[in-house]
From Swiss-Prot:
It is found in: Secreted; Host cell. It comes from the Bacteria. This is NAD(+)--protein-threonine ADP-ribosyltransferase. Signal peptide: none annotated. The keyword Glycoprotein does not apply. Disruption phenotype: Deletion of the gene abolishes the modifications and effects on mono-ubiquitin and polyubiquitin chains. It reduces bacterial survival in mouse livers 5-fold at 3 days postinfection and dramatically reduces bacterial survival 100-fold at 6 days postinfection. It is an enzyme of class 2 (transferase). It comes from Chromobacterium violaceum (strain ATCC 12472 / DSM 30191 / JCM 1249 / CCUG 213 / NBRC 12614 / NCIMB 9131 / NCTC 9757 / MK). Interacts directly with host ubiquitin. The gene is cteC. Keywords: Glycosyltransferase, Secreted, Transferase, Virulence. GO terms for cellular component: extracellular region; host cell. GO terms for molecular function: glycosyltransferase activity.
Length: 276
């Protein structure tokens, strides 16, 4: 069941200008623990995250990173706008698998699919990272780095995966977009969690387990967001699949010490969900 707090609200007017409600500034957030996890967490508390989310939303600087892949949606809905506004958009397959959707460009969150699995909200394109792409797809030029397609710098390693493998909290103190190979060695980050920008190498990385009979997804070569900078989890209130994925994402983040607010959109309005 879904619950709205009713206090944190944003609306988009007919001219696509994004505004804040006066209630947001005065909204208070409980400091009680949720699911055994306190709001005072690594990377800022829930109230701070909400405040930053509102500020970024107002300036049109929010990015959404999808965890599902709907080529038709991105080809028909987002690609033309991104192409016109950013000068990118030449490869819809790549965009659909590694999506940065700027709230200020879209004017709204468009989600026509009932099987949407969820979105993570961040304040910077580079923090969206990318989680999946198929190097075997003809549309993806071999040997080119993602930075040639997208704005911003990309994380050099999968921060959450590396932390789960090492339990080294120092991992969270580095900038994953600027860390050197030597620093990653010192942090003990395993090779399998380091970014692979060369598409041919990604295929090599997946070849051995495939030959052994394992079904390997391209996510074996994933690059993830920096969780301390993620501001929230988008929930499609009309999609049970989205709600289920949102709970899964929140629980996974809580286990690592990050408690993220659920954010839903209805009729051009954004609201925090107390629970899903």
């Amino acid at each position: 069941m879904l619950f709205f707090t009713g206090l944190q609200m944003i609306w988009i007017d007919k001219a696509m200008n994004i505004s804040l409600s006066s209630a947001v500034a005065a909204a208070s957030v409980s400091t009680a623990s949720v699911g055994g996890v306190p709001h005072e967490i690594t990377g800022g508390n829930r109230q701070e995250k909400l405040a930053q989310l509102m500020r970024q939303f107002e300036s049109g600087g929010l990015y959404l990173r999808t965890v599902s892949d709907h080529r038709d949606e991105f080809e028909n809905t987002f690609m033309p706008k991104l192409d016109a506004c950013l000068g990118h958009g030449c490869d819809e397959r790549y965009w659909s698998s590694a999506t940065f959707i700027q709230q200020g460009l879209n004017g709204k969150v468009h989600d026509p699919h009932a099987d949407r699995t969820g979105l993570i909200i961040s304040a910077d394109a580079r923090l969206g990272g990318f989680s999946t792409f198929d190097a075997a797809t003809a549309n993806v030029p071999s040997g080119l780095e993602p930075s040639q397609y997208f704005p911003g710098q990309f994380p050099k390693f999968d921060m959450m995966g590396a932390y789960q493998a090492t339990w080294n909290e120092d991992i969270f103190s580095v900038d994953a977009t600027a860390v050197s190979e030597q620093q990653m060695d010192e942090l003990g980050i395993p090779d399998e969690y380091r970014s692979v920008f060369d598409f041919d190498r990604i295929q090599e990385k997946m070849a051995q387990p495939r030959l052994a009979g394992r079904e390997v997804e391209p996510t074996e070569a994933k690059i993830c967001y920096q969780p301390k900078d993620v501001l929230g989890i988008y929930v499609d209130v009309d999609s049970p699949a989205s709600q289920s994925k949102a709970r899964e994402l929140q629980q996974a983040m809580r286990e690592q010490g990050f408690d993220l607010p659920f954010i839903a959109y209805r009729g051009g309005a954004a609201q925090e969900l107390a629970s899903v």
